[in-house]
Amino acid sequence: MISILGLDGFLQLVGMITIAIFALAFISFILILIISYILLKKNKLIFPSLALFLMDNLYSILLKIFLLIGTEDTFYRVGIEFYNKYYEDRFKKAKKRVLILPHCLRDTKCPAKLTPKGVECIFCNRCRVGEIIKVAEEKGYKVYIVPGSTFLKRILKEEKPEAVFGVACNRDLFYGMNMLSRKGIPSQGQPLLRDGCINTLVDVDELITRLKSL
């Protein structure tokens, strides 16, 4: 073939074939992502162990690929849904659980004080955080209201929970669940409906329902 095409022609042909293979592989990967997302919405996982490895270790690459067909926020939501589905059964079996709530769920005039273990709710009824805490504690959760990820790392070190339920914005929740997954700790997450530094919002009724059912 080299004698027919010449060296330059042969190398050009090899280059074209290589590009075609990579393009086909890339398109196939995109299709797999789309199919996986559709199945995830139907509570089905394909190749769960492989998907977990990719999500845990290659999420930055997955994000770049996902941005070709979606948004960064959508990627985080998909990741959260994946972790929720993947770890649901293990989470239900865990005995020592903690619930992590963001301090931004509080009312702007919240009288509770920040302590070394987070914000200590005084159940003043200015917001629904107290309601969430009561339900969670009845279900055996130890609850923390935290101002940032530093507190989460401290809680993991001191409490050594078997499972963690987190409430946060999509980005923080995804990275938190990703970190927990790499540590082998099953988690569940409830994204905020409205994020920001103050006056954030979560679907309290849905959160309480999940806390009771898990």
From Swiss-Prot:
Please name the PANTHER family in this protein's record. Answer: NUCLEOTIDE-BINDING PROTEIN-RELATED, POLYPRENYL SYNTHETASE
One Pfam family assigned to this protein is DUF116
Spell out the InterPro entries in the cross-references.
DUF116
Q: Which organism is it from?
A: Methanocaldococcus jannaschii (strain ATCC 43067 / DSM 2661 / JAL-1 / JCM 10045 / NBRC 100440) (Methanococcus jannaschii)
Keywords carried by this UniProt record: Cell membrane, Membrane, Transmembrane, Transmembrane helix
Taxonomically, which superkingdom? Archaea
**Membrane topology reported for the UniProt record:** Multi-pass membrane protein
UniProt GO cellular component terms: plasma membrane
Q: How is this protein named in the record?
A: Uncharacterized protein MJ1141
In its keyword annotation, does this UniProt entry include Metal-binding? no
Where found, per UniProt?
Cell membrane
Q: Where are the transmembrane segments?
A: 19-39, 50-70
